[in-house]
């Protein structure tokens, strides 16, 4: 298997059998692991690109998977190192059933054929739904949950149990959305103000304080602890974040707004409205793109 797992976007119009698949990771030239939305369920599937057939459906979480993440760094099960290789790979999943889990899929590397699936371990660390799970550069595991928690776990699993190392909590009623690693052990988490969970008095207090708990929080992972570095405030108008990291720049998009931050000092370098760009004439688009290019070089 290639050591650089390829993010693989699918075109539903080209392959009818892939109509419900959102995207996934290409494991080798014939196998794809992907998310599938079907009949109000969200599952993980293994798909054979050559035959265009689904060969494995993982619905361990009762059809309510919130995220999955390929493990590219070593894990240790009862002190034995495991890592993706020519005949197997490992991934994490999280769910609305308050669990996250570690899975293994084995295959014949010479024929690219699937051979076996194993649920290695599962963990129920909170009393609420788990939004996201990722493995970071040092091999450790992070999750966010709707009980306002961000939890760090060791990459060592003993007797089937994940070891919790550290936990932080945001004030109620903040809900996590995006969880991602910016670069080596530097983490971004978006905490969203959840109107549905707040009462009127709390809403008024938040508005007075300009929603001081919203936005992208930047954390470092150091000595098995989660350390808050910086808060990028003010983007609390609903919608989902997406992001790109380019060298020392963090580019965030939410709704129609795009923000460019310098990761050395977390200053906002540039922002613009996507719909403004789309309405521009070609010459003005080129000028704006040139300005953005210059800003990114600074």
Can you annotate each of these PLM segments?
Residues 1-45, 191-197, 202-217:
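Intrinsically disordered, low-complexity acidic/Ser/Thr/Pro-rich linker and tail segments
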Residues 6-17, 53-58, 118-123, 161-169, ...:
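A short beta-strand motif characteristic of beta-propeller blades
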Residues 18-25, 63-83, 127-135, 172-180, ...:
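Canonical WD40 repeat/beta-propeller blade segments in eukaryotic WD-repeat proteins
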Residues 29-30, 87-89, 138-140, 183-185, ...:
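Short coil/turn segments that connect the beta-strands within blades of beta-propeller domains
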Residues 35-40, 94-97, 144-147, 190-193, ...:
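Conserved strand-to-loop turn within each blade of WD40 beta-propeller repeats
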Residues 44-47, 100-105, 151-155, 219, ...:
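WD40-repeat beta-propellers
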Residues 104-113, 154-160, 221-223:
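Short loop/turn segments immediately following beta-strands, especially the blade-tip
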Residues 283-298:
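Blade-level signature of beta-propeller repeat domains, shared across WD40, Kelch, NHL, RCC1
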């Amino acid at each position: 298997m290639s050591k650089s797992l390829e993010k693989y976007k699918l075109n539903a119009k080209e392959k009818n059998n892939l109509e419900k698949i959102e995207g996934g990771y290409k494991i080798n030239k014939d196998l794809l692991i992907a998310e599938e939305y079907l009949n109000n369920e969200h599952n993980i599937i293994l798909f054979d690109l050559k035959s265009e057939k689904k060969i494995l459906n993982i619905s361990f979480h009762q059809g309510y998977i919130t995220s999955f993440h390929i493990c590219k760094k070593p894990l240790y099960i009862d002190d034995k190192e495991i890592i993706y290789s020519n005949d197997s790979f490992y991934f994490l999943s999280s769910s609305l059933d308050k669990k996250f889990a570690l899975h293994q899929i084995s295959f014949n590397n010479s024929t690219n054929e699937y051979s076996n699936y194993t649920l290695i371990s599962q963990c129920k660390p909170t009393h609420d739904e788990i939004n996201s799970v990722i493995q970071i550069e040092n091999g450790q595991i992070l999750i966010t949950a709707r009980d306002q928690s961000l939890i760090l776990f060791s990459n060592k699993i003993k007797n089937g149990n994940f070891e919790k190392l550290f936990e932080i909590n945001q004030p109620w009623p903040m809900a996590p959305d995006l969880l991602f690693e910016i670069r080596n052990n530097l983490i971004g988490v978006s905490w969203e103000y959840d109107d549905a969970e707040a009462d009127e008095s709390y809403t008024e207090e938040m508005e007075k304080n300009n929603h001081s708990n919203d936005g992208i929080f930047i954390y470092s992972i150091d000595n098995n602890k989660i350390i808050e570095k910086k808060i990028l405030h003010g983007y609390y108008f609903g919608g989902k974040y997406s992001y790109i990291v380019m060298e020392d720049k963090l580019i965030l998009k939410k709704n129609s707004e795009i923000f460019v931050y310098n990761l050395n000092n977390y200053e906002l370098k540039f922002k613009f409205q996507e719909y403004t760009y789309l309405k521009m004439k070609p010459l003005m688009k080129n000028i704006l793109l040139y300005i953005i290019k210059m800003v990114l070089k600074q």
